Amino acid sequence: MFRLLSSCCSCLRTTEETRRNVTIPIIGLNNSGKTVLVEAFQKLLPSKTDHCMKSELTTLLLDEYELSIYDLNGDLKGREAWPNYYAQAHGLVFVLDSSDIRRMQEVKIILTHLLSDKRVAGKPILILANKQDKKKALMPCDIIDYLLLKKLVKENKCPCRVEPCSAIRNLERRNHQPIVEGLRWLLAVIDTCQLPPTSSISISKNNTGSGERCSSHSFSTRTGMSKEKRQHLEQCSIEAKPLKSILQKEGTRLWSKKNMSVTFALDEPMKEGECSRRMRAQNTTKLCYN
């Protein structure tokens, strides 16, 4: 028995010593739900942080990693401090409010500056499309279109994953699991950063939230942004630029999204009907750039 206990203690000590330290700032506009997401991480994962002490730093344990999570303020003054964390960051988490259509233009400007920063370029970024439980929340594919993420990712060689989620206090643990899977994706990419980077956007087919609208079935069968919602987005945008014109100007192809299953390379010309065939054939959405 003593020998068995000694062996277990030795294994635990070895695990602690071999954990890789990873620094991940969590950023986004104010009221996007960053703090609630950090609280969800603390409930789902072992933590070394004293929850009674208010601090921007949270230390979490996930698999063989020890994560230093920085919850940074998203107001105008707080954003001035973001660049101080870029150099030491191994990857970033960007949280946005999927239902706050009026601020999408602001999010686009911030993401453009973020990904083009030399201290960020090439590093993976996990985008948490939060508040999917809200009635007017945009789907991840529509968010990618409007923010021109494909163009940004290709230009800056930043692997990117869009994870739909609904960070709600007192929500069941199982409904928060996709954000942990998104975090695992981020760590997996960080672990392979020594390899030549390949820039991509992937959309998780998982969905979290509450209510019928956010069930896995309803999420996989929604057809994308309706004409009315697209018009509403154009009207609510700060610069009020037509969405279709913006995308065509940037050379982004518009397509009908019948579900979340599509894989294609943008460097190759797409034939008519090709997208819908691939949507039926694949299980994961991933946009790859070579």
Curated annotation (Swiss-Prot):
SMART domains: ARF (SM00177), SAR (SM00178). This is ADP-ribosylation factor-like protein 13A. The gene is ARL13A. Belongs to the small GTPase superfamily. Arf family. GO terms for cellular component: ciliary membrane; motile cilium; non-motile cilium. GO terms for molecular function: GTP binding; GTPase activity. Disulfide bonds: none annotated. GO terms for biological process: non-motile cilium assembly; receptor localization to non-motile cilium.
